[in-house]
């Protein structure tokens, strides 16, 4: 009764969370979807907060984007720094990154600009003084990421010119001077609009010293590189600086569009986001978190919309800067569309293979492309036969991902690849997609911080803020723990059945009830009924015990009697072990027969009995071969029998009878010998088993495909034979995946195909790099995490909201004025821009024919601004 009460309560809470996610993240009526998407960048938010309002000249004026300043006031962490909204904030500085230093300095400058929150400024400076040396000196100046080398000296200069005092040690000062020199070398070596770097200098416009560039030339470069939306490389901070320099109304329109989309005041580091990318990332998060079954209509709607958009999308020239976002989106689209049975061509993301410049760009900046390459690799998991493009894409992605893993200390990379992403790359390369348990993969995705990372942006990975909203995280965890409750109950039930049937106490056989149930329950997150999982497990237990009886316990007389009893379906004349096996089988078949009749009104007694007889007969043939009672078979004869004796189809076809009312049971049974998908499953599971058990079976005198191929091919070594079998597996696996994910060659119910795929994953997991099935403890930790231990997710602490309010002089008027975007109004911004800090003071540049500097470009002006250390 208590279990039922707990389950009912958990189910109600789960449905509440599902409805909440639908409203907040998936409803077509939800506004400002961009605000749900990328995490807030304090750095970019601060740069928008620095722009003054054109209509307020009293005292120090007021910011144009007050919501950005309010966000800064309300989002300092207890430790004194600013971090992306949704980041895991610990009680110490241990998790602080280089990016936090930049964000904190930018926010402090914004507060100082508007003469607000001196206590917050003091706390922020303490953080900077306390952590800069530790973070910067983790590596040599030459190993510091390029983006930090460009941005940090500029932010220190801006902070110093804003009278923000930082106290650094002499040792750190020397390092920072060297860092500044490295920055100067970069600025000298690279053109401002050079496109070869992963992030061109123009992306760091706000950090470029004004005295280093002719203002008129810089304005021309900015105008030339503005996107149609008015942004400079879709960077809010760079666009804010571009607006300060040029007064371009397109930039201003972009900034207003940005802030209008971000209701909480904090802006992301990348905007706008492609609508298809937004939808794809949402579906990916829901799918990999194991939430598909609760949101099928919503997911189908989004994928159909994406597929339609791709159908009419025209090829367009691609800039090197946009490659990361486009390749991330297109490879994700391919994976999600194909895995959900939509037709899609590899060409939608393999375009990068045909452009030598793009390939070279990715290989040169492979560390920054880590998350993108991981997406490409995942997409190639879904390779069909003959898809040469995917073979090449997989080779390219594998080579570069292996280089990332080979770097060892990830803190020395040019991109700040997190240890979490590093672990995910390692996992993807080590474990084949077809050997992963969906339920376990869901847990990994829920727990790993990098699961919300998209591609590397300006100074950090763009991250999905929506995933860190409490409702979605709660839904993923609640769904997982509710599944665990169901799984524990079902495992207890199947263990009771196994014990009652006497299968646990045979004495000679492997007791694998827990392993079998774990494999079939965890292999998929599809909403199969409890009956399907239980029947699969019971069938697997019967097969394991019977197979061991034929291999090690029964005499030839016993084996022939048992096989004949199954043919007659009559236990008369059977001994103790034989009778126990038959009665357990009879109980299972009767259970399936009754439930199938209740669902579909069809009696499948004869079908089931014939299916199981064929399996027992194949075991009898193997026993005769092993004991030398008949001549050794050829490879083809062996494989024909071994495909049946592995009994994968026996489990799948038995359980398929319970896939639901209306399932075409008789049609499938009548055609089962002609189903390619079933035949492929049979040969794959047999070869997966043989390639991991040939040494053991040689010792036991059993026939195995690996040994038989070597014997029939005199010149082949054992390694040659293993490679031959692995090649067959790879080819057949592509054919099998094509049957599962495409209706073109396999017009069967989706649930039937997915049941086959689940069975393949079970065998691939058991026989991936070793024979795990025969171990006693290798899966115990996995089983505990799958059924008992709840996911360990970071607990996100809300930032402490200080009591600061904008002073009256900075408060918005009662009747907000509409800012007219025209040249006259824009000029007012600069006529009233009396900034109190030296760094904003107009400096004359010694002209060499280029004229004087524009006052609007003076935010980082000053002919010889040095690092302002005390």
From Swiss-Prot:
Catalytic reactions on record: (2E)-geranyl diphosphate + H2O = (S)-linalool + diphosphate
Q: Which Pfam families match?
A: Terpene_synth, Terpene_synth_C
Where is Mg(2+) 2 bound in this sequence? 547, 551
Key word Metal-binding present in the record? Answer: yes
Q: Tell me which SUPFAM superfamilies the record gives.
A: Terpenoid cyclases/Protein prenyltransferases, Terpenoid synthases
One function term, GO molecular function aspect = S-linalool synthase activity
Residue positions binding Mg(2+) 3: 689, 693, 697
Enzyme nomenclature, EC number: 4.2.3.25
User: What does the Swiss-Prot or TrEMBL cofactor note state?
Assistant: Binds 3 Mg(2+) or Mn(2+) ions per subunit.
Q: Is Lyase one of the keywords?
A: yes
Question: What tissues is it present in?
Answer: Highly expressed in cells of the transmitting tract of the stigma and style and in the epidermal cells of petals, as well as in stamens.
Enzyme class at the top of the EC tree:
lyase
Biological process according to GO:
diterpenoid biosynthetic process
- Keywords in alphabetical order, please: Lyase, Magnesium, Manganese, Metal-binding
- Give the binding site residues for Mg(2+) 1: 547, 551
Give the residue range of the signal peptide: none
> What note about domains is in the entry?
The Asp-Asp-Xaa-Xaa-Asp/Glu (DDXXD/E) motif is important for the catalytic activity, presumably through binding to Mg(2+).
Annotated PANTHER family: (E,E)-GERANYLLINALOOL SYNTHASE (PTHR31739:SF25), ENT-COPALYL DIPHOSPHATE SYNTHASE, CHLOROPLASTIC (PTHR31739)
The family line of this record is: Belongs to the terpene synthase family.
Quote the protein name from its UniProt record: S-linalool synthase
Task: Supply the source organism for this entry.
Answer: Clarkia breweri
